[in-house]
Curated annotation (Swiss-Prot):
Organism whose genome encodes this protein: Bartonella bacilliformis (strain ATCC 35685 / KC583 / Herrer 020/F12,63)
Protein name per its UniProtKB record: UDP-N-acetylenolpyruvoylglucosamine reductase
Superkingdom of the source species: Bacteria
NCBIfam families attached to this UniProt entry: murB, PRK13905.1
Family: Belongs to the MurB family.
Keywords from the named record: Cell cycle, Cell division, Cell shape, Cell wall biogenesis/degradation, Cytoplasm, FAD, Flavoprotein, NADP, Oxidoreductase, Peptidoglycan synthesis
Length: 324
């Protein structure tokens, strides 16, 4: 694993001639700990917020293909490693990609930067049912589309009609539900696509029923999840026949702590930053839990939290099955 020094000012100066027509904001050396809900992570070499979809398309057309690109949302399900992220990190702004437009009695056109909870609220006002579960998902639509986010027995795949995206060449794509190849907490699409919006469909409902369903979702989160901590949400995907938290608990990992990172006492499938955790602490804790669960019950936990960026030199976390 080669460590690449982060020098955003140098990269920006080198790219400046091809970026002259870009209207969005490009910032060198952005601290990713200010972006992620874990409040950890190294520097993004360049941090780009496109002005609109045309600006993003142009950016892709002029950016040399060998410059790495990483897409981030609102940072809720994201662990950024301490060595930072080489190349360009792209984050869609809510101003340009956060629209919610009702296009029929049961359909919304929704920007990828829209907060999931705002979509739930819009559906309540429009009396469209089937979106209440987004009230309990601490993320944005782009991440929900990619991860097939769900709660309370409902998944994003059940609401998707079309998804709109751009590729690394700046070409536009429209993907239908079949194209998304959805599975549990996953979609299988071509590498490099960036979601910009989606057409979603619910059902005709009424405010009282929708409000009651949203209240139930909120009450559940409040009761069983450490929502006031610095956390990234569910750490591992549930297994086919058993919840991840159960095998974690049975392996004795509830409350397990490494450095400033801890498996929550309240919900042991949630990692929390106790105050000064590093990305290394969090990822080391996660891999330690995976190893202990495997040793205890032979269950193989898969990460649900997205881990991106590079490790600091001499502070590398190997997947547990490489040191098991």
């Amino acid at each position: 694993m080669n460590f690449q020094p982060i020098d955003g000012k140098k990269l920006l100066a080198w790219l400046q001639p091809v970026l002259s027509d870009i209207k969005g904001k490009i910032t060198p050396n952005v601290e990713m700990r200010k972006v992620t809900w874990f409040r950890t992570g190294g520097l993004a070499e360049l941090f780009y917020q496109p002005a609109d979809e045309d600006d993003l398309a142009l950016f892709f057309k002029v950016l040399p293909e060998f410059v790495p690109v990483t897409i981030v949302g609102i940072g809720s399900n994201l662990l950024v490693r301490d060595g930072g992220i080489p190349g360009v990190v792209i984050r869609l702004s809510t101003k340009s990609f956060g629209q919610i437009k009702q296009v029929s009695s049961t359909r919304f056109l929704v920007g990828a930067a829209t907060a999931d909870k705002h979509l739930a609220s819009a559906a309540l006002e429009a009396e469209i049912s089937g979106f209440h579960f987004y009230h309990g998902i601490p993320g944005g639509l782009g991440g929900a589309l990619k991860m097939n986010a769900g709660a309370n027995g409902v998944e994003t795949a059940e609401r998707v009609v079309e998804v709109y995206a751009l590729d690394r060449k700046g070409e536009r794509h429209i993907l239908n539900l079949r194209d998304m190849n959805y599975a549990y907490r996953h979609c299988n699409i071509p590498e490099g696509l960036v979601f910009t919006a989606a057409l979603l469909e619910g059902d005709v409902g009424n405010k009282d029923d929708i409000r009651a369903a949203m209240h139930e979702v909120a009450l559940h989160r409040e009761t069983v999840q450490p929502i006031r901590e610095k956390t990234g949400g569910s750490t591992f995907r549930n297994l086919e026949d058993i919840s991840a938290w159960k095998v974690i608990d049975e392996a004795g990992c509830r409350g397990l702590q490494i450095g400033g990172a801890q498996m929550s006492e309240m919900h042991c499938n949630f990692m929390i930053n106790m105050g000064e955790a590093t990305g290394y602490d969090l990822e080391k804790l996660g891999e330690t839990v995976r190893a202990r669960v495997f040793n205890h019950s032979a269950h193989h936990l898969e990460w649900e939290i997205q881990r991106i960026g590079q490790f600091e030199q001499d502070r590398i976390v190997l997947p547990f099955d490489q040191f098991h």
